[in-house]
């Protein structure tokens, strides 16, 4: 038997605002940051987790993670790792902690970092990357770790098992393909709003011609004339065969979004991302209906599985963009993938930032190897 002996946190920050990297209409000066946690045991091993932020407030998340150390220190490691649903319940269903959410905000993100660290430790002890550990779990075993409270009007545990069972066929081939080819992605490197036209065009060509990306994304929403000019320049730079998405980062009201997006109709958009407030389920539904067939994409600031359920039930988007560090770790992400499969919605997780690509990789790879739903 081993026990958890130490929970160590770090406040990492990078001055990305100095070069406008990460800049958009809502967040013009982000300093990419990470609230990082290491959960250590008396056996000498450890698991790592983190939360991505954009600067101020990163210390608040660190303190929230610190506050959970008393729940972990002294715990039997094997008891937790053998029953990850118990680990989930310790934090998500804590009768006092949940008052701070419930299941949203700093408290929920901090829980996600801790649960991710435990999953990381579980994978290390199994001698496998986390994505492979998840992919190789039997459907019943994986579903037993999941919390279906508030979801059963949309997805039951048995439906989840059936979805995963149906995905077993061809899984070995998909795992082999993933190991050989990797997971598809797109680039936002050219698209930050603070970049000059010249820099945007240069990077758009570099990302597509040199790096080989088949899709780029531009930030929009600050000035319509600028958006139209940049879209025109980007399309001329990359040609007709490269997909272009745009991202407004929640800056528009609903009528404004519909009007603004209407001006983009000539640019064959892959999707319009975060057109309005992430809590506005019906507003997104109205936008999706108005701009169809252009897909609405959103999810990076959705706080929990219940929000995803409501978005899906309302037909509010066509592309789900889960943020791996905003929700409560791998278990909640798997639930959201299963919901996407149930409702036939594509998935393209939120990435970039400090560590987000690394955080989303295990669940993205799992998503591809299961697979639970079509991916973008």
Can you name each region flagged by the protein language model?
Residues 218-354, 358:
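Catalytic core of soluble alpha/beta enzymes
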Residues 367-376:
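Single conserved hydrophobic/aromatic residue that forms the stacking wall/gate
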Residues 2-244, 249-258, 262-266:
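N-terminal capping/lid subdomain adjacent to the active-site entrance of alpha/beta enzymes
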Residues 357-365:
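Substrate-binding cleft/loops of secretory-pathway carbohydrate-active enzymes
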């Amino acid at each position: 038997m081993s026990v958890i002996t130490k929970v160590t946190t770090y406040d990492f920050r990078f001055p990305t605002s100095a070069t406008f990297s990460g800049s958009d209409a809502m967040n013009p000066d982000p300093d990419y940051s990470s609230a990082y946690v290491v959960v250590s045991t008396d056996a000498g091993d450890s698991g790592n987790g983190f939360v991505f932020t954009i600067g101020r407030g990163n210390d608040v998340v660190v303190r929230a993670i610190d506050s959970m150390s008393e729940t972990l220190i002294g715990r039997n490691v094997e008891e937790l790792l053998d029953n990850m649903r118990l680990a989930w319940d310790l934090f998500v269903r804590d009768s006092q902690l949940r008052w701070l959410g419930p299941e949203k905000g700093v408290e929920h993100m901090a829980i996600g970092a801790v649960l991710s660290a435990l999953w990381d430790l579980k994978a290390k002890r199994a001698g496998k990357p986390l994505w492979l550990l998840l992919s190789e779990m039997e459907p019943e075993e994986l579903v037993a770790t999941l919390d279906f409270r508030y979801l059963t009007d949309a997805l039951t545990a048995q439906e989840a098992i059936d979805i995963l069972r149906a995905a077993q066929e061809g899984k070995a081939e998909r795992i082999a393909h993933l190991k050989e080819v990797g997971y598809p992605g797109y680039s936002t490197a050219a698209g930050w709003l603070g970049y000059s036209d010249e820099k945007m065009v240069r990077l758009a060509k570099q990302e597509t011609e040199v790096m080989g990306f088949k899709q780029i994304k531009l930030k929009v929403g600050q000035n319509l004339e600028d958006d139209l000019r940049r879209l025109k320049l980007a399309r001329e730079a990359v040609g007709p065969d490269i997909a272009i998405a745009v991202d407004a980062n929640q800056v528009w009201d609903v009528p404004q979004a519909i009007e603004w997006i209407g001006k983009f109709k000539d640019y064959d958009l892959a999707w319009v991302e975060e057109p309005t407030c992430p809590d506005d389920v019906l507003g997104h539904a109205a936008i999706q209906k108005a701009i169809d067939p252009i897909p609405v994409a959103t999810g990076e600031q959705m706080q929990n599985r219940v929000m995803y359920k409501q978005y899906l039930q309302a037909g509010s988007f066509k592309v789900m963009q889960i943020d791996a560090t905003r929700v409560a770790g791998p278990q909640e992400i798997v639930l959201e993938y299963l919901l996407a499969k149930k409702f036939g919605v594509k998935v393209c997780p939120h990435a970039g930032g400090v560590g987000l690509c690394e955080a989303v990789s295990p669940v993205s790879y799992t998503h591809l190897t299961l697979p639970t739903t079509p991916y973008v």
